[in-house]
């Protein structure tokens, strides 16, 4: 086709001096970015933005001006008048240039003055356009189906490179519909990897009052093709389009859109298939809702003068994605790219929610689904309307929180008070001391601190208390180990540690009887300050439990070694002192302490729980965990109680194995460090009458025994204090890290 115009112009209708009027379409493009011809008019007359014809004045009628342009079959006869078959510009009904009123977008467009109103055009998005394509490659293809007002190739603002897509403006919606039906997924431009996608651009259907009967379909098989999906919905009516949503790796998300020609077949398909039809290879039935048209977010403009700014979208309601904010009810965000076109910087995030819940094809059946005829809402049961966790819903376990937390849960409401996520205690039912778990099952806590041979274990004992005493080389021995009233047999060190409350900032100690009451109260009925206080105490107990338990075992081992050394030293001192030494008491700890160690694993036991569990833990493609029952085929977001008890039993078994291993190691160490046999058999040879005399000299022996406690650690054959300190430090470090 001839692009040039007739260069002959009528002087009477020519442009005013200084204007850009006149010339043909090739050299007169100055006034408009997209025009292919010069706009006419006087010096003050703005040229038509979309004009392709040349010519002088701003009129629409025929004249003698040179008119650049091209022929296509959808223009009326008036478009071809003048200039030997080419579109005319020139004077027209408004008279000579510079006189009379001027039309805002006047140009040589023949009788299509209604097309010049930029509010009447219809904008289409074209995907899978080669990055090397030009306007001349795109325009002729679309002009075969209607009057193309404008073609705009989208380029990157920084680099200037094309983004592989463009926009095409048609004069009427009928022409746009005709182009969509003829070209969508049916024509491949030269150099493209696949067929082009032709769809309405953002908000075009709503702007022109058109209604799309489109369904959103979730729980699709990720290997299913558009043809297979169409076959499922075809029995209910004519399917115009099937769109499968894909991620950045070009893999199906398990959801998509099915477009019907009318509302009745769409409603029939939704009623028959939603919640009933299960695709081959899937475990969950299809979830079908009417697609909710995208609404722009507040503060986001739809674009600049021609086609909109950088926030353009390939389709009007392609993805219905909500950005990860704290409120699930705020307007929808931008869309996902189409299935065959991806921009250089994908906007899709790995964890996003649409208004039907997460893009999870394995959405559990237990989820609550509520819908209307126009919009649909699908949220897991654990989320309330405002994005906060429901008060009747269990907090996800630490294994769930180990990943990125759900983006919509910025804070958790606990008893009417919002607690930040950082103060939330992860994994409390699993890692809390065994004694507190038993207390919840009906066993009372034992509050007072116990004494290991008058070796006091303070109630606020934690990692710091052991470190301050042991690292300084001072053993916390307040009374002699030889006293007869030492309650060694009643040792319950883990219980004392679990009941002890770590000192809160400000050195606020709680009585031992307060802890069970606070732990047994429902979380919703706590005072306003109690939740934070309890969380801090529980966190301190968790961190100190492991280190305290290891330190107690080390102290018991040191106690046995010191008793054995005291026996050997007392045997050497008997000839010099001239009076017998009590012999029955020193042997008592040797028989009691091993029994204490044997009772510790028994305390760690809990009521029997079945070793098998029908619930299993799984992770959805979005990273959220759910639980599936292999017997009832039920899925839940919340962790079932049976699974919680099963995990607790597994952890208790691991703790028992650890305690047995430590006990075995201690026995081996004791066998290696035991004194000669006469040190154990000698007390039985002492007469009974010597016991009162030994009690009379008890005060003298106390001072000597305390000296031995501090000096015998440095004697040959004793434990090196540096090794003790290193062991305690390593135990504390492991406890803090865990």
From Swiss-Prot:
One of its GO terms (cellular component) is ribonucleoprotein complex. Gene3D superfamilies: 2.20.70.10, 3.30.70.330. Keywords: Developmental protein, Differentiation, Flowering, Nucleus, Repeat, RNA-binding. Residues 52-70, 81-98, 301-311 have a biased composition (Gly residues). GO terms for biological process: cell differentiation; flower development; regulation of cell size; regulation of flower development; regulation of seed growth. Residues 109-118 have a biased composition (Basic and acidic residues). It is found in: Nucleus. Residues 609-642 form the WW domain. Coiled coil: none annotated. Residues 1-118, 292-451, 566-595, 670-738 are annotated as: Disordered. Residues 122-203, 213-293 form the RRM domain. Residues 368-377, 435-451, 683-706 have a biased composition (Low complexity). Residues 342-358, 383-401, 575-595, 723-732 have a biased composition (Polar residues). GO terms for molecular function: RNA binding. InterPro entries: Hud_Sxl_RNA, Nucleotide-bd_a/b_plait_sf, RBD_domain_sf, RRM_dom, WW_dom, WW_dom_sf. Its main location: nucleus. SUPFAM superfamilies: RNA-binding domain, RBD (SSF54928), WW domain (SSF51045). It holds the Pfam family WW. Interacts with FY. Binds to SF1, FIK, RPRD1B, OsI_31983 and MADS8. Plays a major role in the promotion of the transition of the vegetative meristem to reproductive development. Required for RNA-mediated chromatin silencing of a range of loci in the genome. Cotranscriptionally recognizes aberrant RNA and marks it for silencing. Controls alternative cleavage and polyadenylation on pre-mRNAs and antisense RNAs. Regulates flowering time, seed size and cell volume, probably via the modulation of cell size. This is Flowering time control protein FCA. It comes from Oryza sativa subsp. indica (Rice). The lineage of its organism: Eukaryota, Viridiplantae, Streptophyta, Embryophyta, Tracheophyta.
